[in-house]
């Protein structure tokens, strides 16, 4: 009997996140011949916001989805560790963190607070600033510059403290 797994994301098909979903799908296909995957690479194309993936997977509309840790951080504040600038000094330090007891703790909290199963925490790189006004070279360059960020209270406070006019997307 064939099993269908519906997978959702919030990036265009060519993004690194969507490419990762393809790799995940191929791994499933290699392990079992009776699993077929269906993708919705970008739920925003269907009028859904990225944070809705949590509810869509919880409610069974999708079986698998990826989401930024920022969207879970209100109920699991330990995830804010990924949003504090300069706290994690290297990629290796991040890997050591997410491959140990920390991931087990977060996994248990995701299960308890969201009724979801955490498959993994992955490295999504580092944040950079860009804008169409002027280069940011000093702290003064941040003053009043509009900056959009994820739905994350820590981001709003942090960017506002730097002088940005921060707003959530």
Predicted segments with their positions:
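A short glycine-centered flexible hinge/capping loop motif at secondary-structure junctions
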Residues: 33-36, 57
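Short helix-initiation/N-cap motifs at beta->coil->alpha
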Residues: 40-55, 134, 151-154, 167-169
């Amino acid at each position: 009997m064939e099993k269908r797994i519906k997978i959702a994301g919030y990036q265009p098909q060519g993004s690194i996140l969507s490419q990762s979903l393809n790799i995940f799908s191929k791994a499933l296909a290699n392990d079992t011949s009776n699993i077929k995957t269906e993708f919705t690479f970008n739920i925003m194309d269907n009028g859904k916001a990225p944070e809705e993936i949590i509810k869509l997977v919880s409610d069974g509309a999708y079986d698998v989805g990826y989401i930024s840790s920022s969207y879970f951080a209100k109920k699991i504040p330990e995830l804010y560790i990924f949003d504090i600038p300069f706290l994690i000094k290297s990629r290796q330090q991040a890997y050591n963190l997410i491959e140990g007891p920390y991931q087990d703790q977060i996994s248990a909290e995701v299960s308890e607070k969201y009724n979801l199963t955490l498959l993994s925490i992955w490295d999504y790189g580092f944040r950079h600033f860009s804008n169409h006004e002027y280069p940011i070279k000093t702290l003064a360059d941040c003053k009043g510059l509009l900056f959009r960020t994820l739905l994350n209270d820590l981001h709003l406070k942090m960017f506002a403290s730097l002088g940005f006019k921060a707003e959530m997307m």
